[in-house]
Amino acid sequence: VVEKFARPLAGAVLTTLALVAAVLVSPASAAGAPPSAMARTVYYSASGYSAEADQAAQIWNSRVPNLRLVRGGSATIRIYATTGGGSRAYPCGLGCATIYIDSQDVAAGHSSLRIVAHEVGHGLGLPDNYNGVCSYLMSGGSAGTSCRNAYPNSQEANRVNQLFAGALTASAVDSGVYARG
């Protein structure tokens, strides 16, 4: 009786192992595709502070392997210039925000690149951290006008990388309004 079931069972196990091996050695992994090949693409547009938006995208792309910010397409992160009211972001989910960069903040001496990169951070799922420490991008204006750092620190970059790896759903992202205080 055991021999009657052993041969078909062994065949089924071998077939399952072959299928698993085929999936694990897909053409992408066999070709040694870089991790960025799996990055989630988020499109952005910038009618104001365009050069800063492009630089901010390069910064985030260099620090977050699971994210690829690209200008154009059906933009879900939209950046506009405004006068008055403070620089602010209105997140609408992970990889989605309407951002206003206040020219008065720039005129007051704040780095326009830091402001744009900070506000984009909200669209990527990060909250404000008004601790006044310049090495924290999300400390925003609390770090003062002398702070020129436009790069997320490793903690901030790792958090965005987790979010875009699918470790958390978009509903886990704070969708509050962020305005410079």
Where are the language model's segments positioned?
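Secretory targeting and sorting signals
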Residues: 1-32
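Acidic/histidine-rich, surface-exposed loop or edge segments in extracytoplasmic proteins
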Residues: 35-46, 96-102, 140-141
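A short alpha-helix/helix-coil micro-patch that ends at or immediately precedes a cysteine
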Residues: 43-69
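Active-site recognition of the HExxH zinc-binding catalytic motif
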Residues: 60, 114-128
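Surface-exposed patches in mature extracellular/periplasmic domains of secreted proteins
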Residues: 64-74, 126-133, 171-175
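Short pre-active-site segment immediately N-terminal to the catalytic Zn-binding motif
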Residues: 99-116
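The catalytic-center signature of Zn2+-dependent metalloproteases
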Residues: 110, 123-170
